[in-house]
Amino acid sequence: MVFNSVVFLFCFLPLALLAYYLVPGRGKNVVLLVESLLFYCWTGVEYLPLIVCLIVFNYLWGLLTARTKAKLKGLLPAVAVLVNLAALVYFKYANFLIDTLNRIGNFGLAALDVGAVLPLGISYYIFKIISYEADVYTGKVEAEKDPIAFAAYVLFFPQLIVGPIIKYRDMAPQLHNYKNRCNAALMERGVELFLFGLAKKVILADSIGALWTDIISTGGVGLSNVSTPLAWLGIIAYSLQLYFDFAGYSEMSNGLAALMGFDCAANFDLPYISASITEFWRRWHISLSGWFRDYIYIPLGGNRKGAARQMLNMFLVWAATGIWHGASWNFIVWGLYYFVLLVIEKNFLLKYLKKCPLAAHIYTLFFVVLGWGIFTANQPGAPLGLLLNKLFVPQGGISPVYYLRNYGVFLVLGCVCSSVLPRWLWERISRNTAVKAVVSALLALLCIAYVVAATNTTALYANF
């Protein structure tokens, strides 16, 4: 079940909010946990034992850590992290590792039967759990004594599909604040966030994404038949689709959280206005970047142990970033691609970029869009070699004229909505309550029309 489905919007969400608001005090966490379990099990219960076992194990780990003498505490986080990573590696990476070993050494290892679909949200909730373990071990938070609160944090359904990866230390105070859980200002913000996120997903992402799908799908024109201009148009469309899909879901997630009384930090901050790759990664998937910074880069020494060590730390972080996104070599290459760009910027390029903002912006967009070409290279119909050939070796083929005529409005709208203009405009609309209400109602009706007519309700980042 996804946020932009008819079932979620018109059945699950209204009933979930009604039950949540009716139950007072600590009972809200119980209701939240039950709703999260129902949400998790909607597509099947085969992975329910996995997440229940992980919740029980990590809850007991926290209690044990709180009672263990200092001399033994160093062993406990290592064991806990290994257990959690083992679950992630088994379901997400085991067959990729087996296939890689077979290619390297012809070992003839058989693939494991881990299911065709990943356990829902495993990449996100494992990282949430590890952040809890790290913060408990370092004393940033106390171990959670309430099993309901801990389980509600791990299973929190607004963040289960595509995050954001909210740290426990940011959620814990809110999980235990029952009196002020629901207030009018936060609920109003929640409605706005959810509505804007839904619009980004169903109006922009899905409409723009149809262009890229038509280019690479077997039922479409096929990448091998397109011209160089159409290849560029297609990868730009994919770049916009990915942004509006992921940013839209992140806003819907934060909107749902706000409706339930939780104030969560934004996961995106207009990344396509960036004037460097460094700035781009401060604005894109902020919760993931922050997680790698806090739990890998800084513990490894960050930039405190000399230039060579810093380069090694950056290499490990960006290799891990690529691997986190999927069990495929293109994701690893994509992560290392950004490592190289960031090293170049850090060592000399940034000072030149600051002198010419327009050139810096064009440079950033070019390499980000090119990076998405590497990112999407595991999709059937979009092999990296063919895509790069189409992009950089001028050649004829199907013209982009038809696609500009059919998708041009959405592409222009996508570019405009990637800028600061919508934020500036909404600030002015919000000054007049009546105008704000009318605009919100019209946008909601438009979103509903798109939701009802939609044939595809998937979330791109749910696959990671």
Q: What are the residue ranges of the model-derived segments?
A:
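Membrane-embedded transmembrane alpha-helical bundles that form the catalytic cores
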Residues: 1-463
